[in-house]
Amino acid sequence: METHLYSDLAFEARFADDEQLPLHLVLDQEVLSNEEAETLRYVYYRNVDSAGRSTGRAPGGDEDDAPASDDAEDAVGGDRAFDRERRTWQRACFRVLPRPLELLDYLRQSGLTVTLEKEQRVRMFYAVFTTLGLRCPDNRLSGAQTLHLRLVWPDGSYRDWEFLARDLLREEMEANKRDRQHQLATTTNHRRRGGLRNNLDNGSDRRLPEAAVASLETAVSTPFFEIPNGAGTSSANGDGRFSNLEQRVARLLRGDEEFIYHAGPLEPPSKIRGHELVQLRLDVNPDLMYATDPHDRDEVARTDEWKGAGVSRLREVWDVQHRVRLRVLWYVNSFWRSRELSYDDHEVELYRALDAYRARIAVEYVLIRAVRDEIYAVLRRDGGALPQRFACHVSRNMSWRVVWELCRHALALWMDWADVRSCIIKALTPRLSRGAAAAAQRARRQRERSAPKPQELLFGPRNESGPPAEQTWYADVVRCVRAQVDLGVEVRAARCPRTGLWIVRDRRGRLRRWLSQPEVCVLYVTPDLDFYWVLPGGFAVSSRVTLHGLAQRALRDRFQNFEAVLARGMHVEAGRQEPETPRVSGRRLPFDDL
């Protein structure tokens, strides 16, 4: 609840410069695993209009749309394009609650008022609370725009989902419109009743009956602490029914001068030797939100207003591909309800948005099909002759006809399973993130390695041969018998110094024996985008991932994973804005890790 309140205040503070409607989301075990929730580091979001353009893009030309070349570095463009693309993403604050909870009970325990039409039990093993922004330029919301959500982990891995604004807003906008109409009608009725009441008050002496006016005058003339007798007259007016003690008590309660204690010319009792006994509000809490003057009266804090109004609706929203389901909390006192936002939901724009979305996600399948076509092209070119490139002992009695059948079925199975988790995408992502600066850094490291060392100038080059250098590859393991594909497995590859064949190990240094299993085929992709389609026995089809026909912007939009962007509004607990040390998930992150 604190995360949502803080984010709502942050969105309200910068609404004039960046018009966004806050969406308060809750992610649970249906979206993330327990390990993913506990290690989550960054939450990013961006808005894409119906034409597929990221809103809020930095000004610049469209040189990004040039088709990519064979060289992956040419496909990524320069640092300027990378920086322009990075600005379209915004970072959101979040909080991880790593314990089981029931959502509505948790909100009530936090002090919120929950007024739902139909309450439902929402059990969560853990929860991630965050707030994303939906752009509304000129107070106009379009149901055809798309909200992209990206979760990033410390190792650089990330997951993306896309949500249509129509699914997020349609029911809430209709409900908010009904609430505003009901509130307007209620206010109008109160005004009518108030005007009628004022008219009665102004002419009460003329319209009320004479008996009622007489009784009203009698009640006003009678003191409050003097009890009337049965005849309607006061007993303190000389009828002798009350004793002298009772009369003195009545005068004491009435506040006569003789019963008031006067302290004399001393200071007021709230001061001792000139010092205030009661601390002012400004001394107790200098960050009090409504403290314009120390002697002003206390006003209701925004937190109390937020809790008192509470939650009005809880919605479940699916992403465009119906892979994950999020929950959206709509608060009564969220600032956007007073902005009179207009909502447009046109079918034509919705179809345009879906077409643009399909074009964006088609980039990964274009890459996958390009790799498959390249494998078949190499097989036709070489006439089916494959060299052994990976170390593996092969029996002489091995049936190669079965291997070729296995290759065909394995490729079809891999095509059905491959997605953004594939080894191709994992090898491509770092190159897109690094840009031209990374290319210059690699060239500098290569020059440093090739330059002669001081000891080599004095004593000559060393003849001793050290262990072979390992490279980090990614693999897609196709298990034909199980009809299962393990995507994006990270491995370590090094050449055997005796045979020159590749030896593959896992991250712990254990030898991978996939090639010795007759039902397994493996696709390896190197950081330079060279790939090996390996059959049982270590015989491989080798080539390069071609990037012809793909726009640079489409590549970056879909696969780019940039470093952390320092954004405002990251301090959940302290309520401050210090981008140097952002605090997320309840712990402070060192600046060196960003």
From Swiss-Prot:
RNA-binding keyword on record:
no
Give the subcellular location.
Virion; Host nucleus
Ranges of biased composition (kind: Acidic residues): 61-76
Task: State the InterPro entries in the record.
Answer: UL17-like
What is one Pfam family matched by this protein?
Herpes_UL17
**Main localization category:** virion
Q: Does the keyword Glycoprotein apply?
A: no
Q: Which UniProt keywords apply?
A: Capsid protein, Host nucleus, Late protein, Viral genome packaging, Viral release from host cell, Virion
GO CC annotations, alphabetized: host cell nucleus; viral capsid
In which family does this protein belong, per the annotation? Belongs to the herpesviridae CVC1 protein family.
Protein name, entry field: Capsid vertex component 1
Q: What is the lineage of its organism?
A: Viruses, Duplodnaviria, Heunggongvirae, Peploviricota, Herviviricetes
- What gene is behind this protein? CVC1
